[in-house]
From Swiss-Prot:
Keywords: ATP-binding, Cytoplasm, Kinase, Manganese, Nucleotide-binding, Nucleus, Phosphoprotein, Serine/threonine-protein kinase, Transferase. Its cofactor is Mn(2+). It holds the Pfam family Pkinase. The modification Phosphoserine is found at S166. Changing L324A: No effect on binding to CBL2. It comes from Arabidopsis thaliana (Mouse-ear cress). It is found in: Cytoplasm; Nucleus. Belongs to the protein kinase superfamily. CAMK Ser/Thr protein kinase family. SNF1 subfamily. This is CBL-interacting serine/threonine-protein kinase 14. It is an enzyme of class 2 (transferase). Residues 22-276 form the Protein kinase domain.
């Protein structure tokens, strides 16, 4: 069922604007849990796509994990054939993905009008394999590749979108395989149907084979009105390649749609395939992030004081309802994590905190950015404080604490330190939207 709720605009903004940063235009797409609108940056005029997701529908559908993965994964990816995620905003009931706008629409809409020639099929397949290989090299498997998830930009170049079903390498079980049944029926690999575990890279390659077949033929290789009959065809690899297909493409399709994942062609082999190599720019397979997977853009890295400026991705990643620490952090080492928003400067917070911990005879080690590690009570207390610039006027202070009962019986956190952080909290107006959580606990 499609989410029929209207777009929720923060109350302090004019109707049709999102946090005063984006003008929200016409609806360009919708699904069971999200709607996508065309938008425009009020600062630059740049066109963006705004994907609006209902938190309530996610929670009812048990899909919080999907949205967490999509935020985490898209934030890490920088490739010309992958839709760019600019930022994530949120209110109490909605999450807003602000993404690159693909003006050309879905590849599915183009191919549904008729099959492509081999040269055009090859061009899109080259862009697809470049992006998929890039994801795999970073331990990310899409698991739901299909023409509906492939968009086109204004130059009609391909862009992969919708990473909601994607898997990370940390989801692989001890047998080295993934075990979650994912994907769209006609694109599902035979080993997924067998429910014995599968290699995420291999099933993406199978889906790429289905996509290439569709581009060349104009129809699906495995299709039947009876789902079980279709699954049997997939499992046995029963398909016919159109007679107009060239011998080189025929050989490549046969290797892509090999029902045995052990002998199925690999990304490296695809790149060296004779049909694939025609007109291929080798630079497309050599995209690297230069160790910047989780870095912010240059204008967001450091303020004049040196406190790191947070973007909305950092904020929503830290909110209790959508905690991404399992994907990135080591929060399990601490028994409590709290966040406070304050109008104090980072320098002032550090100076005052140093005075308090000095009076308590605690050991302090300063971090490179604005923050510190505090230890004391003969190893029974440890705390890490990090201060990040939220806006020009506000900072967010994250406190990670581990504490065991001290011999004195005194609770250092409850009696002394937490009251200090509560004191400096910036009290937000009651009508403010909720892109941040003020002094939250996870």
């Amino acid at each position: 069922m499609v989410d029929s709720d209207p777009v929720e605009f923060p109350p302090e903004n004019r109707r049709g604007q999102l946090f005063g940063k984006y003008e929200v235009g016409k609806l360009v797409g919708c699904g069971a849990f999200a709607k996508v609108y065309h938008g425009r940056s009020t600062a630059t005029g740049q066109s963006v796509a705004i994907k609006v997701v209902s938190k309530q529908r996610l929670q009812k559908g048990g899909l919080n994990g999907n949205i967490q993965r999509e935020i985490a994964i898209m934030h890490r990816l920088r490739h010309p054939s992958i839709v760019r995620l600019f930022e994530v905003l949120a209110t109490k009931s909605k999450i807003f993905f602000v993404m690159e706008f693909a003006k050309g629409g879905e590849l599915f809409a183009k191919v549904s009008k008729g099959r492509f020639c081999e040269d055009l099929s090859r061009r899109y397949f080259q862009q697809l394999i470049s992006a998929v290989g890039y994801c795999h090299s970073r331990g990310i498997f899409h698991r739901d590749l299909k023409p509906e998830n492939l968009l086109l930009d204004e130059k009609l170049d391909l862009k992969i979108s919708d990473f909601g079903l994607s898997a990370l390498t940390d989801q692989i079980r001890p047998d080295g395989l993934l075990h979650t049944l994912c994907g769209t029926p006609a694109y599902v690999a035979p080993e997924v149907l067998a429910k014995k575990g599968y290699d995420g890279a291999k099933i993406d390659i199978w889906s790429c084979g289905i996509i290439l077949f569709v581009l060349n033929a104009g129809y699906l290789p495995f299709n039947d009105h009876n789902l079980m009959v279709m699954y049997r065809k997939i499992y046995k690899g029963e398909f016919r390649i159109p007679k107009w297909t060239s011998p080189d493409l025929r050989r490549l399709l046969t290797r892509l749609l090999d029902t045995n994942p052990q002998t199925r062609i690999t990304i490296e082999e695809i790149i060296h395939d004779p049909w694939f190599k025609q007109g291929y720019d080798d630079r497309m397979s050599k995209f690297h992030l230069e160790d910047s997977d989780m870095k912010l853009p240059a204008d967001e890295t450091d303020s004049e004081m040196g406190a790191r400026r947070m973007n909305a991705f950092d904020i929503i990643s830290g909110s209790p309802g959508f905690n991404l620490s399992g994907l990135f952090g080591d929060a399990r080492k601490y028994d409590r994590v709290e966040r406070f928003v304050s109008a104090w400067t980072a320098e002032r917070v550090v100076e005052r905190l140093e005075e308090i911990v000095s009076a308590e005879n605690l050991t302090v080690a300063k971090k490179e950015t604005w923050g510190m590690k505090i230890e004391g009570q003969k190893g029974n207390f440890a705390m890490v404080v990090e201060i990040n610039q939220l806006t020009d006027e506000l900072v967010m202070i994250e406190v990670r604490k581990r504490q065991r009962a001290a011999a004195s019986g005194r609770d250092l956190w409850t009696d002394t330190l937490r009251p200090f952080f509560v004191e400096l909290v910036h009290e937000s107006d009651q009508t403010d939207p909720e892109p941040t959580q003020v002094h939250t606990t996870s």
